[in-house]
Amino acid sequence: MDHISKKCSMNAIVGTTNAGKSTLINMLVGQKVAAVTPKVQTTRVRMHAVLNNENVQLIFIDTPGIFSPKTKLEKFIVKHAWMSLKGIENVILLLDVKNYLNKHIEKIISRIKQSNINAILVVNKIDTVPTSSVDKAIEHMYSLHSFSKTFTISALHDIGLSRLVDYLCEISPNGPWLYPEDQISDAPLKFFMAEITREKLFLSLHHELPYSLSVVTEALEEKEDGSLVVKQVIYVTKDSHRTIILGKKGEMIKKISMESRSDLAKILDLKIHLFLFVKVREFWQNHLDECVGYVE
């Protein structure tokens, strides 16, 4: 394909916590590139996901949910969320239709206005409420900002996504692609693999597990038979958290390992040998540069 005919755009997805940003990213790209759990604050750093649609490359920037930061980790997360608005064509405000009165939305819109970037409103989870509630949410959002376009979707059930993609392709400027045709994410392999395990932890320990954990892929080793040995460390802040993750007679950590290994094997098309270790590191959130792989 002649590069002159190619189009490319950067599209940041912003919104409050648990609006469905990672689910939307994964559905658009067609593969799991971001952790998806029912809990808030599961996206921690900016991640670029890539969708190639004929002659158009759409790059989506998966950002953390916006919330009031307290620890160094939380401040790091919020800083990276707003950094995503630099050098992009479009900002997509993803709205949970049942949470349109969230106190943080006006702050987000204020930052969007300051950026002077084309803003698109995408109302998510429309399958969970009547049409009248969707209309009410849209009316409220337009009282705060004049969006260039509005889409109503259910990211989880792939409703309305094709219209959103078609529109983004239509308005993308001419230009060369920024990523190779077969690349769907810019997340380093170790980070990507840690995200898979972190997702399984949150899904399995939905009520017991706090956010004060991190998963780090410490070692990858390719064996002669082509399989991959993966060693990961789960950092927690308390011994009680470690006990929860291990489970009775180690059953929970075995379950997490099996589910993560299965996903990794399917996605990478490799046999995976996964070894998980749980370590207690008090206040690791305030030591980002030492053990948990958060770097700027």
UniProtKB/Swiss-Prot annotation:
The keyword ATP-binding does not apply. Residues 62-65 are annotated as: G3. The keyword rRNA-binding applies. Residues 153-155 are annotated as: G5. HAMAP family: GTPase_Era. Belongs to the TRAFAC class TrmE-Era-EngA-EngB-Septin-like GTPase superfamily. Era GTPase family. This is GTPase Era. It comes from Ehrlichia chaffeensis (strain ATCC CRL-10679 / Arkansas).
